[in-house]
């Protein structure tokens, strides 16, 4: 490993960008990834039907920071793309994050107006809140609405992803998708929302295209790396490594699950190709 100044474990977005930054500072960089492809969870490919597929689920690049979008624009052309999502509840489609349209979808006009009025009165300067906040609200109408969403969506969806019962869900997980207090649609509210014109793999290839970067795939890095805590050394292939090690993988694996395994949510992908122009009301429906 004497030939390298930096070893980066993981060739996802963080690993690729860090490698590029070091390479531009004239550092020799080696990237290891256990997968047989670059791009991490952003990896995409064209399938046998000519469809560009995001192998690990849909990914939209989004940020509020102009300088970040300017940076990624050095490595790819981008097309504006505002992601919209929805949910099927009791056989009816409604947008997510849930908004005032959701109230209209599941309550009669009189009750819907009462709930929306209560929300406006209780949250005059707020655009959204978490379901946890609404579940604990003193107003009965607001609390009832939150209970409906929790019972029919949040608890089921989250429990399925994390593989636990609704009662075992960590409250912090329920804060990820807020409830909106307006009719706004769109999953993100960031100014910059884009998809690469070509593909994410093309974007990653351009980031990694540098004479100071070497990529090795199908490598179990943790089989070759040892953290010598007694001597405060990094040991690679039984030799001390005096360079920089950047690790972007699962933190519990790095420490050999010394403090137990961390919980991770998971998905099972089933690929089906339909011979129709449009299959559902939004790009993502849960």
Region locations from a protein language model:
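N-terminal Rossmann-like FAD-binding beta1-loop-alpha1 element of flavoenzymes
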Residues: 4-31
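Short His-Asn-centered micro-motif
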Residues: 9-11, 32-34, 61-64, 152, ...
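Short, solvent-exposed loop/turn segments at secondary-structure junctions
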Residues: 13-15, 36-39, 101, 221-223, ...
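Glycine-rich FAD pyrophosphate-binding loop
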Residues: 23-48
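Short aromatic-enriched loop/helix-cap "lid" or pocket-rim segments at secondary-structure transitions
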Residues: 42-45, 98-100, 259-260
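Dinucleotide-binding Rossmann-like beta1-alpha1 core, especially the glycine-rich loop
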Residues: 49-122
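Active-site/ligand-binding neighborhood in enzyme catalytic cores
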Residues: 90-94, 101-244, 255
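Mid-domain catalytic core of redox enzymes
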Residues: 222-286
